[in-house]
Amino acid sequence: MSSSTVWILISILLATVGAVVGFFVRKSIAEAKINGAANEAKRILDEANRDAEALKKEALLEAKDEIHTLRTEAELEIRDRRSELQKQENRLMQKEENLDRKDETLDNRERQLEKKEESLVAKQQQIEELESKVGELVQKQQTELERISNLTREQAKAIILGKVESEVSHEIAVMVKESEVRAKEEADKKAKEILSLAMQRCAADHVAETTVSVVNLPNDEMKGRIIGREGRNIRTLETLTGIDLIIDDTPEAVILSGFDPIRRETARIALDKLVQDGRIHPARIEEMVEKSRREVDEYIREVGEQTTFEVGVHGLHPDLIKILGRLKYRTSYGQNVLKHSMEVAYLTGLMAAELGEDEKLARRAGLLHDIGKAIDHEVEGSHVEIGVELATKYKEHPVVINSIASHHGDTEPTSIIAVLVAAADALSAARPGARSETLENYIRRLEKLEEISESYEGVEKSFAIQAGREVRILVKPDTIDDLEAHRLARDIRKRIENELDYPGHIKVTVIRETRAVEYAK
């Protein structure tokens, strides 16, 4: 054999021996790992068994503790319940003993009442016997007296009663008269105290109302623009408002004259806006007058709300509040009716409080007592009748309605508050300087002029201007033609002559205006 072959054989032999040796080595290593894993598993199992045993013991201990706790709590609860039951039993026994004692007491009282009843029956019998004996004695004495005096019992009784009546009647009359005098003196004294206290606690200011307003101008050139070409601007403003515009030498001022304060205020606002705007022509004047009317209406509503707030009267109907605000622009003998109504409300409330009456209801009645004056120039009837109608319409309290109806003595007052309203009205009106007779007569004459003019069919509106020396009547052109306009002027003139007393003469002007308006599109 060659040496290479020998080396090959040796290499094969060595590889075989190495493979066998490696096999046994790996086998021993694997067996060692298996034995180690088994030992580890046994160790883990032993630890798990020990832990489980410990947990079991711990759980048993906790269960025993919990059972002991529950048993202790149950015993305590049972002990408490037994104690409560024992207390209830004791209370029941005590109540039973009390009932037994009360029963015994009632029995004793019943026996005592029976004894008293027997005693009363015996006494009643004795009294009846005595009454019978007394009656017999009285009858015998009456018979003896009748025999001696020759008078029957009825005759003697009549004589005695007559003497007693004559003596007592005089004494009663004297006592009644003295009581009446004392009552009147005390009533007068109390009334004076109440009135003086109310007057001292009520402070009201009154400013004499005038029939003119002044609009300031930026310069005298504005007067010519207000007059307009051929006077058309001033005529339009006077026709729409029913107010006289007096443009004289007064520097930078125009005077508005009119008896109706609402119209005068509307004209003042409109003219003031026109002066500020600078555009003064008939169409613009109509627009401003209409806008001013809306502003005045809104201001009137605000005045009514402010008045009710100041006086402390709440719950008035919104329409009644607006009518109340109109009183700011009404006067009675020169006295502002709204201020007068507020003063009457305060006085009535103060006097009602002194007498223990409803102060809020008294103020309400005092505030509304002259509500009819707000529209008496628009609706037929006296301001009392109109006020009653308004209060009834808006479902006011019956005391308020009666106070309105009776404050001038037209009907009888049915409550103390109605009497107080009449007294407060007299106090407010009779105060020196509160009213002016001349101004009131003047305003009534102007109102009568407008009333006569507006009573004819076809008349849309009328305005008394020039201090009552002229009345302008606006008629409906579709109802009154030109010939009827002349006839209407004559009829109104005759009625004015027959029904009114006035100095000088009154000019009657009937205005009939027809407008044709078309819009190009």
Curated annotation (Swiss-Prot):
A Pfam cross-reference name: HD
Any Gene Ontology biological process: mRNA catabolic process
MF-aspect GO terms: RNA binding; RNA endonuclease activity
Keyword Nucleotidyltransferase: no
Annotated spans, Disordered: 87-117
Keyword Transmembrane applies: yes
Residues in coiled coil: none
Species this protein is from: Bacillus mycoides (strain KBAB4) (Bacillus weihenstephanensis)
Gene name of the encoded protein: rny
Protein name (database record): Ribonuclease Y
Domain HD: 337-430
This protein's GO CC annotations: plasma membrane
HAMAP family for the chain: RNase_Y
Gene3D superfamilies: Hypothetical protein af1432, K Homology domain, type 1
TM segment ranges: 5-25
Lineage of the species this protein comes from: Bacteria, Bacillati, Bacillota, Bacilli, Bacillales
Keywords: Cell membrane, Endonuclease, Hydrolase, Membrane, Nuclease, RNA-binding, Transmembrane, Transmembrane helix
